[in-house]
UniProtKB/Swiss-Prot annotation:
The protein, known as: Uridine kinase
Family: Belongs to the uridine kinase family.
Gene source species: Photorhabdus laumondii subsp. laumondii (strain DSM 15139 / CIP 105565 / TT01) (Photorhabdus luminescens subsp. laumondii)
Gene Ontology BP annotations: CTP salvage; UMP salvage
GO molecular function: ATP binding; cytidine kinase activity; uridine kinase activity
Catalytic activity: uridine + ATP = UMP + ADP + H(+); cytidine + ATP = CMP + ADP + H(+)
EC number: 2.7.1.48
Keywords: ATP-binding, Cytoplasm, Kinase, Nucleotide-binding, Transferase
Binding site for ATP: G15, A16, S17, A18, S19, G20, K21, S22
Ranges annotated as spanning the membrane: none
Compartment list: Cytoplasm
Length: 213
């Protein structure tokens, strides 16, 4: 049953692919969770809301532009944020990076005092921006993002080097310039130098921690 008096603060963290936004989000979540407990803070990656492609062949899935807003089920994410703000639990989708589709099983996710939402396309959607109490854009040079993406996708996601570079030039960089970089204007806070900017992390931790009290 929804709790109309429930207070849930949504913090959005966006930026280019491999900009360090996930590192910042996970660092904030891990350190704040140690202070306030699991029941007060949670984290939701936008990647969980890539559209289900189980009806497509693997060849068709490879052709999907995963850096375009149309690849995301923002309708579902929006409805989930509304539910969480009402004190309702959700079933959080899980995405399989190897199969390029949504996993059959979801994870039960209970409402929290603070939810950190992180992803590349969050600030491109006006509805999502309106659900956020404040937002952050991680501003990292694209050449650094590319090197990080190669390391991540080859070693952690089983991709070939050629496929990562081809995707970068074909969709990642063009979509960043068309959608993600322009969305920086909507951020309340700009963080340079990615996830290793400890000063920024400490400032954000103090700010977000206020909402957990």
């Amino acid at each position: 049953m929804a709790d109309e008096a429930y207070q849930c603060t949504i913090v959005g963290i966006s930026g280019a692919s491999a900009s360090g936004k996930s590192l910042i989000a996970n660092t904030l979540y891990r350190e704040l969770r140690a202070q306030v407990g699991d029941h007060n803070i949670g984290i939701i990656p936008e990647d969980c809301y890539y559209k289900d492609q189980s009806d497509l062949s693997m060849e068709e899935r490879y052709k999907t532009n995963y850096d375009h807003p149309s690849s995301m089920d923002h309708n579902l994410l929006f409805s989930h944020l509304q539910a969480l703000k009402m004190g309702e639990s959700i079933e959080l989708p899980q995405y399989d990076y190897v199969a390029h589709t949504r996993k059959p099983e979801a994870i039960h996710f209970a409402p929290k005092r603070v939810i950190i939402l992180e992803g590349i396309l969050l600030l491109t959607d006006k509805r999502l921006r309106q659900e956020m109490d404040f937002s952050i854009f991680v501003d990292t040079p694209l050449d650094i993002c590319l090197m990080r993406r190669i390391k991540r996708d080859v070693h952690e996601r089983g991709r070939s080097l050629d496929s990562v570079i081809e995707q970068y030039h074909k969709t990642v960089r063009p979509m960043f310039l068309q959608f993600i970089e322009p969305s920086k204007q909507y951020a309340d806070i700009i963080v340079p130098r990615g996830g290793k900017n400890r000063v920024a992390i400490d400032i954000l931790k103090a700010k977000i921690g206020q909402f957990c009290e």
